[in-house]
């Protein structure tokens, strides 16, 4: 994880079993070490904020493991003067596009006292961008409530249901649409080649088809999708089609420009061979 540069990490601490107001000195993340008996701890670092007890982190991890086929892992953590964040990754919900992996999980956040003190929300990480998606589930910080841990785990379960919905949405609409558009674009390019009247072999045909944009140019489009508010509306399919047409239109326009250059190279090569044969 990361620790903000303005934080002075001069004190280590074993975290307690209950919620307490943070002490007026800096507490940093302590990882397990072969030469130490310290455990992982997550704590906010101001007298105005709350820390996240390590027992609660373990309880959350254990609870999430009961609903996941593969062990849940702590993908990342961040400690600042404003907030403490822990990101739980679900390996069975990660999606791969060629060599790129989309990480899916839940972000647990603790902040200042108030309505935003504790929040759980699904996140998606793709192309070095971590973005919160879907609904956020919040719990107000109330020290008098003895069942806080149970309530916090309960909203984690609700957030997990939201995460499953989002992943299903990705697979059924976004990735399906991407595959359809890639196939459609290759059909367009193949038709253009035939209309030019070039009788080229499979090798040259494949070289031309290799100019087609594959999934990799769609990072910008994917980021738009997962950030779009329309993702959670009934008009999502229409919105995604319009955005895809715009992105694909630009992509295929440049591809056909490249194809035109490729065609010109073939013409010059044929002319050169014809000239050499005449000699």
Regions found by a protein language model. Give the residues of each.
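Long, contiguous regulatory modules within eukaryotic nuclear regulatory proteins
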Residues: 41-96
């Amino acid at each position: 994880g990361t620790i903000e540069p303005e934080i002075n990490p001069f004190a280590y601490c074993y975290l307690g079993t209950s919620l307490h107001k943070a002490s007026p000195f800096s507490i940093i993340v302590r990882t397990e070490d072969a030469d130490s008996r310290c455990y992982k701890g997550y704590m906010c670092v101001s007298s105005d904020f709350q820390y996240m007890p390590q027992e609660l982190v373990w309880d959350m991890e254990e609870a999430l493991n009961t609903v996941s086929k593969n062990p849940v892992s702590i993908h990342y953590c961040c400690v600042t003067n404003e907030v403490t964040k822990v990101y739980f990754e679900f390996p069975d919900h990660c999606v791969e596009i060629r060599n790129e992996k989309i990480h899916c999980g839940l972000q647990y956040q603790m902040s200042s006292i108030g309505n935003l003190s504790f929040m759980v929300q699904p996140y998606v990480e793709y192309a070095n961008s971590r973005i919160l998606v879907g609904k956020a589930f919040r719990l107000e910080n109330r020290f008098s409530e003895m069942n806080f841990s149970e309530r916090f785990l309960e909203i984690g379960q609700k957030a997990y249901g939201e995460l499953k919905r989002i992943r299903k949405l990705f697979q059924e609409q976004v990735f399906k649409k991407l595959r359809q558009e890639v196939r459609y674009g290759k059909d367009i390019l193949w038709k253009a080649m035939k209309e030019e009247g070039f009788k080229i072999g499979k090798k040259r045909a494949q070289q031309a088809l290799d100019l087609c944009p594959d999934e990799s140019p769609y990072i910008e489009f994917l980021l738009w999708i997962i950030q779009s508010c329309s993702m959670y509306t009934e008009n999502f399919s229409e919105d995604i089609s319009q955005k895809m047409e715009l992105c694909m239109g630009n992509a295929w326009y440049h591809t056909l420009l490249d194809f035109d250059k490729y065609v010109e190279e073939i013409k010059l090569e044929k002319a050169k061979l014809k000239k050499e044969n005449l000699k």
